[in-house]
């Protein structure tokens, strides 16, 4: 099992404190890995800064070829990556193989092509006797911090556009789920020039702070919690670094009287509980119009209670464990707080399961009120609440009454209503009669405290570039 760091094209052991990496399905230690020392963080950043002088001047074609080689290598090692991700995260193995690995490969291939397609304002004589042109140039060294819920996929979302644009990257995966990023490092060292891609391991306070605060780091990209985002913004503010933040969500799912209730119930079953609900876009905050509220509660109760929890390697498993014991405790506390409210009905689930591993039963909480914490705060687990609403204006007001602004969905057969709401919902993405669907060609990102900046799409590539004006007098 690959446990070494990648610094300047060489795999090396960490020189810092050793950290245990767990299998959340069993609670057992998989292995111990040594963190990067401050000196190693410095070496990785300096290697990236040195490599940038040449990598930043390579042609888009050359960068695309490297990304395509990495995509091919991931595809060729798909089963090994899937097993590592499943073991380290508790994800059902078949979900990683069938859903995540193909999407990861596609992201690298998309940005390989996108690197060759950047466009801008036409060059011309906007001032007599002077020709102006626009350049989109790479930024420099990018520090990327990946989360623990989709370790390899989020690494791909960060690495692909940054490298495609000509930046050099130092990436730190979560200390909870580092295995696939470290495996990726072993493949990347033979594809990219030394220093272009560096992979470190360690905790935020010991490695992340040193990395993001380094004077040679020009941009920090984070997918994580609001509190982590706030910390990084405060930490990097004195240096005025560019930042790219994706900080979670609490997606409203608005179901009107005319919606296909079977489709909505199946949608919540799938999109609210995929990855054990550990997803920023999870369909977790349901609003049902009064006329169909009771019927939808019943359908959702049946749908959610039918989800099969089990071992990640079992092909029939739909729901795996939460990522860590600490997170299991957070989810349990959030649900217990909700259950203490007299108006909350627990339709199914509501507690962690007995036995080994960090499993929490798929949970549906009915009759939640707009002001309840279970409606307002991100739980990031297999927990869905449902609230009754009366009309379009009320539900729009409630849906937007949130500090989050990442994803939302509207379920209705009324095309006009779908357009009205999608235009007024304060979310980076709104799906109509579906949820959770992502493609490499379309942007993913939020507003409000869900952050700013886009992943995927040409917009994501542009986020990793600088716009410069060149004027020639003649």
UniProtKB/Swiss-Prot annotation:
The active site is at residues 246, 280. Pfam families: Aldedh. GO terms for molecular function: aminobutyraldehyde dehydrogenase (NAD+) activity; NAD binding. It is an enzyme of class 1 (oxidoreductase). It comes from the Bacteria. It catalyses: 4-aminobutanal + NAD(+) + H2O = 4-aminobutanoate + NADH + 2 H(+); 5-aminopentanal + NAD(+) + H2O = 5-aminopentanoate + NADH + 2 H(+). NAD(+) binds at residues 146-148, 172-175, 209, 225-228, 280. One of its GO terms (biological process) is putrescine catabolic process. Its EC number is 1.2.1.19, 1.2.1.-. Keywords: NAD, Oxidoreductase. CDD domains: ALDH_ABALDH-YdcW. Pathway: Amine and polyamine degradation; putrescine degradation; 4-aminobutanoate from 4-aminobutanal: step 1/1; Amino-acid degradation. The keyword Lipid biosynthesis does not apply. Belongs to the aldehyde dehydrogenase family. Gamma-aminobutyraldehyde dehydrogenase subfamily. Homotetramer. Catalyzes the oxidation 4-aminobutanal (gamma-aminobutyraldehyde) to 4-aminobutanoate (gamma-aminobutyrate or GABA). This is the second step in one of two pathways for putrescine degradation, where putrescine is converted into 4-aminobutanoate via 4-aminobutanal. Also functions as a 5-aminopentanal dehydrogenase in a a L-lysine degradation pathway to succinate that proceeds via cadaverine, glutarate and L-2-hydroxyglutarate. 4-aminobutanal can spontaneously cyclize to 1-pyrroline, and 5-aminopentanal to 1-piperideine. HAMAP family: Aldedh_Prr. PANTHER family: ALDEHYDE DEHYDROGENASE-RELATED. This is Gamma-aminobutyraldehyde dehydrogenase. It comes from Salmonella paratyphi C (strain RKS4594). The gene is patD.
């Amino acid at each position: 099992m690959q446990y070494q760091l990648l610094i300047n094209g060489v795999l090396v052991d960490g020189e810092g404190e050793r950290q245990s990496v767990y299998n959340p399905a069993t609670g057992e230690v998989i292995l111990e890995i040594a963190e990067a020392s401050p000196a190693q963080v410095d070496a990785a950043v300096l290697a990236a800064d040195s490599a940038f002088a040449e990598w930043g001047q390579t042609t888009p074609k050359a960068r695309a070829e490297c990304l395509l080689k990495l995509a091919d290598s991931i595809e060729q090692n798909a089963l090994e990556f899937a097993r590592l991700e499943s073991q380290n995260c508790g994800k059902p193995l078949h979900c990683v193989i069938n859903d995540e690995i193909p999407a990861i490969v596609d992201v690298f291939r998309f940005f390989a092509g996108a690197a060759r397609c950047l466009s801008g304002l036409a060059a011309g004589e906007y001032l007599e006797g002077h020709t102006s042109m626009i350049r989109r140039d790479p930024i420099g060294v990018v520090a990327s911090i990946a989360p623990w819920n989709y370790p390899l996929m989020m690494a791909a979302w960060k690495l692909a556009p940054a490298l495609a644009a000509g930046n050099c990257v130092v990436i730190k995966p979560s200390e909870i789920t580092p295995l696939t990023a470290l495996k990726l490092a072993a493949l990347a060292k033979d594809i990219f020039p030394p220093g272009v891609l560096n992979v470190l391991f360690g905790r935020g306070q010991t490695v992340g702070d040193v990395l993001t605060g380094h004077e040679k780091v020009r941009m920090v990209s984070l997918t994580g919690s609001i509190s982590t985002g706030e910390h990084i913004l405060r930490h990097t503010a004195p240096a005025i670094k560019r930042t790219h933040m994706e900080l979670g969500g609490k997606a409203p799912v608005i179901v009107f009287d005319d919606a296909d209730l079977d489709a909505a119930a199946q949608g919540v079953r799938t999109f609210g509980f995929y990855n054990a609900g550990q997803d920023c876009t999870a369909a977790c905050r349901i609003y049902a119009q009064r006329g169909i509220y009771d019927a939808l509660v019943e359908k959702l109760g049946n749908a959610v209670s039918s989800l099969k929890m089990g071992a990640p390697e079992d092909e029939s498993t739909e729901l795996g464990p939460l990522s860590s014991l600490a997170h299991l405790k957070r989810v349990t506390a959030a649900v217990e707080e909700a259950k203490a409210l007299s108006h909350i009905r627990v339709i199914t689930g509501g507690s962690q399961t007995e036995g080994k591993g960090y499993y929490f039963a798929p949970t549906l909480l009915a009759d939640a009120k707009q002001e309840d914490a279970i409606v307002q705060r991100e739980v990031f687990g297999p927990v869905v609440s449902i609230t009754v609403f009366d009309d379009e204006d009320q539900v729009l007001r409630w849906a937007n009454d949130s500090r989050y602004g990442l994803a939302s969905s509207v379920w209705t057969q009324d095309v006009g209503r779908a357009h009205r709401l999608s235009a007024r919902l304060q979310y980076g993405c709104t799906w109509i009669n579906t949820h959770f669907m992502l493609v490499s060609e379309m942007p993913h990102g939020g507003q409000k405290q869900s952050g700013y900046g886009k992943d995927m799409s040409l917009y994501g590539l542009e986020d990793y570039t600088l716009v410069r004006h060149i004027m020639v007098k003649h």
